[in-house]
């Protein structure tokens, strides 16, 4: 990305602008494929047009001054003729560098004269074209009474130019006197030469002072010129901004008040609709928050119910284990009873009857506890089912229904298992009672038989 403060122009636009500035040498072919001779000639014309300085004339003035000097200076100058072309290029390079630096390009070098690059040449010429446009626009703005600062600037510039011309005239006069004194040096009158030499030295000192004053004034003039150009550029930017603000205000002033009021009413209505929609969304958000909290509470209660059911299931397993132990004990008692019958010990029959009665009481208590737990679980399930039906959202109902169905199926399975265990237990008790009855009958018969035998 270029860091220049001016736009890079297209070649047709660039050529048109340069030809409008009387640079007829600038053609599309020459700009696209620049040669050293083309750029040197074109840059000389540009420097002569915009700075009023001709590099060739500067070198010619220097040569004329040396040719009119003494013999030693003439010999040095003759030796330097060998490098005359090089001096011309170096002088042009120095002047071009200063000129392009003033218009915003700081990387001009001597290779841009010897071996010009098409892109760099286009960039330099774009800077010249933009500078020419800026000068033309600035002169149009400064023309007449439209810009008082511009008028003062032109008057001050004319004044400085007049002073500069006067000082150049004085400088030329002093040069002519020096030349005359050099001619006097060729005479044989030693005293006249010494007097003329002193006068010449005095004039030279005065000339040096005038030259220094001229240099200081010229530098001051350049600084003043640069300051005025900066002020002019700033005023141009301010003018553009003010024109833009004026166009905006004019647009607003031409707008119909009824249209503005209608737009305000439409915007107010739109604002009210947006506020109503916002309130609805906030209410929906609150409802969702309440539903979410209810769902969390229901989920927590469901977890607690599952824990209770799990505890009940563990109790059922424990009771089942107790029943199995009781069954095992009954079977063991049956075996012991058979052993007692075979051994003829009647005392243990009474103990067996007591154990049987104790097991019946435990079985009755177990049935009562089981019925109480079943009633409590049924009431809890009914309450949970009612709460799920009334409070939970339809999506959550499906989830909870699956949980409740699973729990109900589990409880039903356990109830069925408990009923089966109870039936088995009742059957075993009946079987034991029948066996006990048969045993009593056998014992009675046995005792009767023994009594008959003893009697």
Curated annotation (Swiss-Prot):
Residues 184-298, 343-380 form a coiled coil. It comes from Eremothecium gossypii (strain ATCC 10895 / CBS 109.51 / FGSC 9923 / NRRL Y-1056). It is found in: Nucleus; Chromosome, Centromere, Kinetochore. Component of the NDC80 complex, which consists of NDC80, NUF2, SPC24 and SPC25. Pfam families: Nuf2. Acts as a component of the essential kinetochore-associated NDC80 complex, which is required for chromosome segregation and spindle checkpoint activity. Belongs to the NUF2 family. This is Probable kinetochore protein NUF2.
